[in-house]
Amino acid sequence: MSNKITRLSERNRVELRPGLVKTNLSYNEETMLCHFTMVKGSKLEIHNHLAVQNGFVLRGRLRYQLADGQKNVYEEGEIGPGGSYVWDSMEYHSTEALDDVEFIEFFAPARKEYIAE
């Protein structure tokens, strides 16, 4: 399982849910780099996963929330172009697109559910 050298224009785009499109870039079993677009108003509800998640916003603005479970939000804010973030392994987080947004995310370990797509 490895895609060492890739080009965004040559990769398959997958709509994960309405308004959210993912493109896998380079990855192996330990790490994964993905390109995402989100349509203004689309949301990812509070969730968590094993992978540490680092992101960098290329255009648009995201509203994020961090929580200590499904409901208790302890931090929220906005991230715009040039902004970056990191969510720890199993940290609950949510995202809403305040504009049409384009961003890159890095996961460690690679998200196996994304590789199958």
Residue spans for each PLM region:
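Residue-level recognition of short, solvent-exposed, well-ordered loop/turn junctions
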Residues: 39, 58, 80-81
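Glycine- and acidic-residue-biased ligand/ion/polar-headgroup-sensing regions
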Residues: 51-69
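Conserved short histidine dyad/triad with adjacent acidic residue
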Residues: 32-49
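A short, N-terminal "cap"/entry segment at the start of jelly-roll beta-barrel domains
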Residues: 1-30, 77, 116
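Short acidic-glycine-tyrosine-enriched beta hairpin
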Residues: 69-89
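Ligand-binding loop in jelly-roll beta-barrel domains
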Residues: 78, 89-113
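Short beta-strand His + acidic residue motifs that chelate non-heme Fe in jelly-roll/DSBH
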Residues: 44-46, 64-65, 87, 92-98
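Short, surface-exposed secondary-structure edge patches
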Residues: 35, 54, 75-77
